[in-house]
Amino acid sequence: PWYTTRNQIQEVVESKRDWIMKKLEEYNVSPRKAKEYEDGEKFQILGESYYLNIYYKDINNAILNVENEKIEIILPLSYAEEDNTEQIKKMIDKMYYMIAEKEVESAMEKTRKMVGLAPEEYKIKKIKYAWGTCSSRKVITINQNLMMYSRKAIEYVVLHEICHLKYMNHSKKFWEMV
């Protein structure tokens, strides 16, 4: 929260130091190169690597398939000479959103059974600075880009935000609940 002192923040970070270091190693956090949405590019889905394959065929509408570690995008032949980066980006964003709908619903249900709490409402969207948020109106928002990480990571973020329904802070009681 905005009123938290620097010392309080430092205490929490220090108390979670081992966990933070373990997670940094686990996820190998490093600056990521911006996606170019090109054939052969690697994307993460639920913690697994998938490679983008772009094809052009005699069809009317674009198609996206995800299977066997591949994201296959088939575009109409008439698009072959154009820059399709924006369309491919939109298709991949929609793919992540659709995955998020299923995965977040599952994580919400699992967490509801575990802690007996559920939000009034939840949303899925891109958030620039957080994996999830919980508003004072008890609305949880989950970042659709979280779908790049494992189900355990998704379940943790959902649990974290649901615990904010009871404790709208990062107090000791909040962390005990998490």
What residue ranges belong to the model's regions?
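Active-site-proximal or metal-binding-adjacent scaffold patches in catalytic folds
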Residues: 1-156, 165-178
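Walker B catalytic acidic pair
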Residues: 161
